[in-house]
Amino acid sequence: MPIRSIPLLVVAAWLGFVSAAAAAAPAPDDPYLAGYAGAVLEREFKVSRRAVSVDNGVLTLDAAQLAGADRARILTTLSALPGVTRVEVREAAAPAAAPPAGAGADPTAAERATLPTGFLPVGHLFQPLLADPRWPHFSAAYRYYFGDPDLKHVGAVSFGETIPIFRGNAPGESQWEAGIQAGVFAVFQMDQPSKDLFNADYFAALYGAWRQGSFSTLGRLFHQSSHLGDEFLLRSRIQRVNLTYESVDLKLSYDLPWGIRAYGGGGYLFDQEPDLLPWSVQGGVEFRSPWTLASGQIRPVAALDLQSREQNGWNVDVSLRGGIQLENVRLFDRNLQLLVEYFHGNSPDGQFFKRRVEYLGLGAHFHF
């Protein structure tokens, strides 16, 4: 079988798996969501399941039953449940003086807060792209490269975060958010005696996000630069590329039934060195199972990310990741995911952006 056909077969098999899973499973209905959300409230927050009701995917919480609980964390956790379109908190109506004759009664007050607002709020309006090789987050992975002249056994780590600085409410029960992203992505040659650093990319961004119901968008202005490891540079005498650029990009995302999400977008480089062609496009699909295993402790997840750049002749870079999310393992309110990963395309490691690579790996990822 030609090697070029392998990524297409892998993508086709992955899409077939997601389609079959979606077709075989009924959409999460309101009774299912009520039971699921109630179990989360009781298990993680010691709040009675009677505090939640569901209508067409909208969760309504009784504020009186949330007394003493971490309301912000409850909103963040329940908003992330598959099938949930919005979370509201119904406050108890305060006694009021009788209205003047002929005046209509005020409607019941309700806090339509999908997520908390203000400075340094918890949660995120735009969810992470699980298979994007350059999404800032904390991770560590082993990768095996096929047929690469320099890489075979590789350790890959990333250190990064998305930090919302301010979030506010917007018309139509939508919300907006502004913040920063930053990350470092490094790969090491594990088969070298000193485990040489091969390449490190540095990323920093200002971002704005907006969400209404199942639709969300993310726009970024960012800088990225790339650097070779000293040991590799001295040993190989390779010609170093001074790769650095600024970029703007925009991503659109929509949450579908059965835990499926689709997204797409594009980007444009400027102030780039060397003189790279500027345009790029990106799209993908994710599956976060609404159904869990092992008494709610394990959630299957899978993701496909496709990217194409003008600089590389619009060749498609294929990134596939799939595995499990451990629901009972959280660090700083982040979920731990154990994922098998496959990549075929132009290298995401900046110094080697012209090189076609293929690898298979296994990693641990912390995502919000």
Predicted regions and their residues:
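N-terminal targeting leaders
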Residues: S5-A103
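Transmembrane beta-strands of outer-membrane beta-barrel pores
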Residues: Y142-D148, I165-R167, A182-F188, Q212-S214, ...
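Predominantly the C-terminal beta-signal and adjacent terminal strand-loop region
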Residues: H124-L125, G313-F368
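Membrane-embedded beta-strand positions of outer-membrane beta-barrel proteins
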Residues: F138-A140, A178-A182, G208, G219, ...
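Outer-membrane pore/translocation modules
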Residues: G172-G284, H344-N346, F353-R356
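Transmembrane beta-barrel domains of Gram-negative outer membranes and organellar outer membranes
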Residues: G104-A209
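Short loop/turn motifs that connect adjacent beta-strands in outer-membrane beta-barrel proteins
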Residues: F126-D132, F166-A178, D255-I260, S289-P300, ...
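Residues on the lipid-exposed face of transmembrane beta-strands in outer-membrane beta-barrel proteins
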Residues: F159-I165, L206-Q212, L250-Y254, G283-S289, ...
